Amino acid sequence: MYKVDLNCDLGESFGSYKLGLDEEVISYISSANIACGFHAADPLVMDYTVKLAKAAGVSVGAHPGFPDLVGFGRRNMNVSPKEAKAMVQYQIGALDSFCRAQGIKMQHVKPHGALYNMAGKDLKLAEAICEGIYEVNPELILLALSGSEMINAAQNIGLKVAREAFADRAYEEDGSLVARTKEGAMITDEEVAIKRVIKMIKENKVTSITGKDIPIKVDSICVHGDGAKALEFVKKIKLSLEEENIEIIPLHKIY
C-alpha cells in the first residue's frame, strides 16, 4: 500500500488579521507547519494552533521564515548562512516551547517561502539550515522540496528528511517550483491537481510546465489552507487518495 503525508501551513494569522481556514482544514491533514512569528503569527496564534493540532491528533512542525511580515516571507533576503541558521533555531525554539507546554513533541521543520526556495538551490544556505535543525534536535525531520539542495544537505549530515511535492504548483524541468509571478505557476483545476498528485505518488513522475515528464519522489504532499476553494480541495484530495488505496499518515510514521 502506498503511504503519504498530507501537510498544510497553519497559524498564519496575526493580531486581529485572520488568515486561512485552520479550524476546518485541520481535520483532513496529517501534519501541520506552524508559523513561528517571523513571516506570520504571534505568540497567541502559535499557542492556539499547537492546541488545535493536538486536539485533532495532527503532528506539529515549525515553519520558520524570513523576518518579513509585510512580504509574508515571500521576498528574498540577502542573509549569510550564519544568520539563516540562527533564524531557524530561534523560531524552532519559540514553537517548541508551546509544544512542550502541551506535552507534545515537535515532528518536523519546513522552511517557509523565500527561505525554502533559496535554500532549495543554494547548498551553503541549505547546509546552514540543516545544521541548525540537527543541533537543536537530531530527531527532527526536515520537510523539503523533492530533488532540492536541502535534501542533499540533510542527507550529508544524517538529518532525517522528507521529500515534499505540491498539489497546486507547477514545476520547471529542473524540478524547482515555477515562480508565482509566472503564468501557469498555480494549478487551479482541482481534477488536474489531484491526478498529478496520484501520478507523483504511484509513478514517481510529474509533468513539468513545458509538458515533459520529470522524475520525482514524494513523502509528503502540501495543500494550502487559504483561498476560496481551499477547504473543498483538501477534502477532495484526501478522499481521492484514499480511493486510490493511498494511506495518509504523519511523517514520523514514514520514518
Swiss-Prot record:
UniProt keyword list: ATP-binding, Hydrolase, Nucleotide-binding
Keyword Acetylation listed: no
Gene3D superfamilies hit by this protein: Glycoside hydrolase/deacetylase
Coiled-coil residue windows: none
Catalytic activity: 5-oxo-L-proline + ATP + 2 H2O = L-glutamate + ADP + phosphate + H(+)
Record EC number: 3.5.2.9
Source taxon at top rank: Bacteria
Example GO BP: carbohydrate metabolic process
Pfam families: LamB_YcsF
UniProt xrefs under CDD domains: LamB_YcsF_like
Broad class of enzyme this protein falls into: hydrolase
One term of GO molecular function: ATP binding
Family: Belongs to the LamB/PxpA family.
Subunit architecture: Forms a complex composed of PxpA, PxpB and PxpC.
Record function comment: Catalyzes the cleavage of 5-oxoproline to form L-glutamate coupled to the hydrolysis of ATP to ADP and inorganic phosphate.
Protein name per UniProt: 5-oxoprolinase subunit A
Annotated organism of origin: Clostridium beijerinckii (strain ATCC 51743 / NCIMB 8052) (Clostridium acetobutylicum)
Name of the coding gene: pxpA
